Design a protein with these regions (language model features):
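Acidic/His- and Gly-rich active-site-bordering loop/insert found
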Residues: 2-115
Length: 115
């Protein structure tokens, strides 16, 4: 495979399967525990240094956070759907944000993408 298009085409079935899986288990804002676990594991697998939970989210700046009772319900739902218990526990209070760092070893600018 030479071109990026050929590489993307080869990954297409995996990407489609992942998208369909995520759509089977929709999660609203501050309750994306299952999705965050999937993203964290994939980023680590790809070699990123991953920070999440209270390390990257300022709880005092969060708006529209569900009640603690609701958050507990969504955390349990994520666990029932296969989320990693250790990761979910670190996202207490709906702190489902993730920051991934890829150190290229080269001097230069830092680029951030937010999704």
């Amino acid at each position: 495979m030479n071109s990026i298009w050929e590489q993307a085409e080869a990954l297409s079935p995996q990407i489609i399967a992942q998208r369909r899986d995520l759509h089977k288990f929709p999660e609203t804002g501050w309750t994306e525990f299952r999705t965050a676990c999937i993203v964290i594991k994939k980023l680590r697998q790809l070699g990123y240094i991953v920070h999440f939970g209270a390390d990257v989210i300022d709880g005092s700046a969060m708006m529209g956070v569900p009640s603690e009772v609701s958050l507990r319900k969504y955390m349990q739902r994520a666990l029932n759907e296969g989320a990693d218990a250790e990761l979910v526990e670190k996202m207490q209070g709906g702190k489902t944000g993730i920051v991934a760092v890829l150190d290229s070893g080269k001097v230069g600018k830092t680029i951030a993408f937010r999704f």
